[in-house]
């Protein structure tokens, strides 16, 4: 057996055995991208199930697990200190972070209240207090490092599918290189 054959065999074995651990998290948003994700899952389940382990996706299952994750998808803007702490925790447990949708990528429309007048802020203060929300809404990237962005409200399906394909290829290549260097 030639060394290149062994490397190829290892790569094939890795691709069959190792699924990417995926997390999907929602913060302040309407969760329209989560709806699009579940619709895409209907179309791509057989393919994705071979390569993705849906470790934490609350819309799909009740028993979710925390990281580590290969990829975490984060939908929604960050509106509270509790959300900021949670998104930092997710970042620490994830190789890659993908900001999903307009609220996560741009902060909007959730952050429209950042432009409110003092009178408008006074009108909504009871809601901010009730939910322990901060005065300002932040993009995910204002709180943590983001590796990929999928814009849109709801998310752009084409960019999402391209991002999934890119991440699967990149992580598998990284795994194969890691295995090869340990030979």
Tell where the protein language model's regions lie, with residue ranges.
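Iron-sulfur-associated redox domains of electron-transfer enzymes in respiratory
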Residues: 3-183
């Amino acid at each position: 057996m030639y060394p290149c054959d062994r490397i190829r065999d290892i790569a094939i074995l890795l691709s069959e055995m190792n699924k990417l651990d995926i997390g999907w998290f929602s913060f302040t948003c309407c969760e329209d991208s989560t709806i699009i994700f579940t619709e895409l899952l209907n179309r791509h389940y057989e393919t994705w199930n071979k390569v993705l382990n849906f470790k934490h996706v609350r819309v799909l299952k009740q028993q979710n697990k925390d990281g580590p994750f290969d990829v975490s998808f984060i939908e929604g803007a960050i509106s509270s200190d509790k959300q900021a702490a949670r998104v930092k925790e997710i970042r620490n447990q994830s190789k890659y972070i993908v900001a999903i949708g307009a609220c996560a990528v741009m902060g909007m429309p959730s952050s429209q209240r950042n432009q409110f007048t003092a009178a408008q802020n006074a009108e909504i203060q009871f809601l901010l207090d009730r939910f322990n929300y901060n005065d300002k809404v932040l993009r995910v990237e204002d709180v943590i490092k983001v590796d990929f962005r999928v814009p849109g409200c709801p998310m752009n399906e084409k960019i999402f599918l391209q991002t999934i394909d890119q991440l699967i290829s990149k992580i598998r290549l990284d795994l194969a290189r890691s295995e090869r260097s340990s030979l």
